[in-house]
Amino acid sequence: MVAVRFYAVEMSLPCLCPCPSSPISLSLCSPRFNLLNTTSRRLGLSRNCRTLRISCSSSSTVTDQTQQSSFNDAELKLIDALIGIQGRGKSASPKQLNDVESAVKVLEGLEGIQNPTDSDLIEGRWRLMFTTRPGTASPIQRTFTGVDVFTVFQDVYLKATNDPRVSNIVKFSDFIGELKVEAVASIKDGKRVLFRFDRAAFDLKFLPFKVPYPVPFRLLGDEAKGWLDTTYLSPSGNLRISRGNKGTTFVLQKETVPRQKLLATISQDKGVAEAIDEFLASNSNSAEDNYELLEGSWQMIWSSQMYTDSWIENAANGLMGRQIIEKDGRIKFEVNIIPAFRFSMKGKFIKSESSTYDLKMDDAAIIGGAFGYPVDITNNIELKILYTDEKMRISRGFDNIIFVHIREI
């Protein structure tokens, strides 16, 4: 007779201005998980790394301390609300959307730079972090911003030029190139910029010339026009909130905080181990480092792991999926296998020393629907918390593997 256990199971971008649809569609596909080779100075090992793409950004070269001081408390609250949101808002949960919108309203009610369109601080390149209504984008915009690997910028140059412009840039990668859609711009008042799209082109690294983007802007009339209000510009000039004529709200940044910089590196699949070392060094305070294993659902987005031939072994070692931490000392590893089926492994944890926990995992099963099929596997793991906050955790676990988890809301 086969023993069967029963479980109660809970089933569970836009361009920055309105741009007309195009008869051309562009599709760049990439797998959700990627293997890459990177060298971890912390571990002294060469490993294959597993990455879940997330939306984040970093373009600053200043130090982390300077970045941190560039934002006031209300701005940091908005930035904190953005941490872990995928697709620049496209995949945000209702709570995440509410947190971001609340933080946006607080900033819009504060006194930022008066008449931002007259300020030199609005000039330069801005990176799109979040949009509250990504569904209002045109089909070609959704093709670009719906894939996390793309980075979206906005260049604003209104003063000290005979050709004021607002340009939207979709950067595919450093090796492929970008698409730039340009608009003639004019200042209407202290907050509003009027624009009219008039040209666009692909700038591809492997071609010695630009490829025109075939959209007949002149024939589109009012569809190629719009306006953009800046409702908040930070005194440091590093954060901007804008609202477009389609009702969309945009959050843009010039500089980023340390967590955003690390998450951007993970998203780009380059130099992750080095970025983790840099982040940990900048956040280390040995006299106070005593991190707790915070409760909640934590999705793994990166690990310095070495894959084995057995996915179930990887799952049992916490090398994939999510960890669900409960405050009564219970923990669960959970991995989605195929639709309607997942691997679940339950256990308990106790704190053995500062920032270190002993995990005993001994209740594994393949779950399909409301039924659980036992798997005879046990595991003992020492988990060292290297850094944690309310949104992100860096830890060292099975076989000295480094993990980065994002807390799910």
Swiss-Prot record:
Protein keywords: Chloroplast, Plastid, Thylakoid, Transit peptide
Cited Pfam families: PAP_fibrillin
Coiled-coil region: none
Localization (cell): Plastid, Chloroplast thylakoid
Listed InterPro entries: PAP, PAP/fibrillin_dom
A GO-annotated cellular component: chloroplast
Stretch forming the transit peptide: 1-55
Transmembrane segment boundaries: none
Chief subcellular location: plastid
Keyword Chloroplast included in the entry's annotation: yes
Family to which the UniProt record says this protein belongs: Belongs to the PAP/fibrillin family.
Name of the molecule in the record: Probable plastid-lipid-associated protein 12, chloroplastic
Gene encoding the protein: PAP12
